[in-house]
């Protein structure tokens, strides 16, 4: 092989912080409890790739008769570096014994960066509502907020499509906010009856709004039957 210049390396710095609080609400509502937390995480990653520069190869008829040195301005079209015309068919070159000058002209190492951040808040309260013959009706209510942000910046060589054998890649940058309100109620229907030691009905609903998509409401019903 002429070269094995194709390594990739990824380095990621990650941090995550969570602060939560839970307890009893007896002073306000007897037998009710609360649970809340705030979370923040950040991922900062560099991805480094070995590249072969396209402007050192493609404009010159793919190793054929073209010559960078024949350009009127004497520099490559994209990077603007002084032209060199490697001796493509020299046995030493084909064996991978490439001079330092040719390597500097043909090869490089480029680094892109991706930063992803996430902030989340959630609060939930639950407790008894009233009594039925079969037991206590329990209710849970909660809210949630999630903010996500990403900024992916490929190396400039990839942004302008100057990596030979690779496709171009643009900057990806954006954010998304998700807000939700949810609730669930558990209703005991039967207890200690023939063929029904316990029958419980659970009902839940969740309203979710995503700023880039819109909002929707989902519902769920479940029946537990213990013989």
Placement of each model-derived feature along the sequence:
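Surface-exposed, low-complexity loop segments enriched in small/polar and acidic residues
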Residues: 1-179, 192-194
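Glycine- and other small-residue-rich loops at beta-strand/loop junctions that grip anionic moieties
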Residues: 10, 210, 224
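Beta-strand-rich binding-surface signature
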Residues: 138, 180-182, 200-202
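Solvent-exposed loop/turn segments connecting transmembrane beta-strands
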Residues: 175, 208-217
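Feature captures outer-membrane beta-barrel proteins of Gram-negative bacteria and organelles
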Residues: 181-183, 187, 217-226
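Detector for outer-membrane/organellar transmembrane beta-barrel domains
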Residues: 194-200, 222
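Transmembrane beta-strand segments that form the barrel wall of outer-membrane beta-barrel proteins
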Residues: 198-211
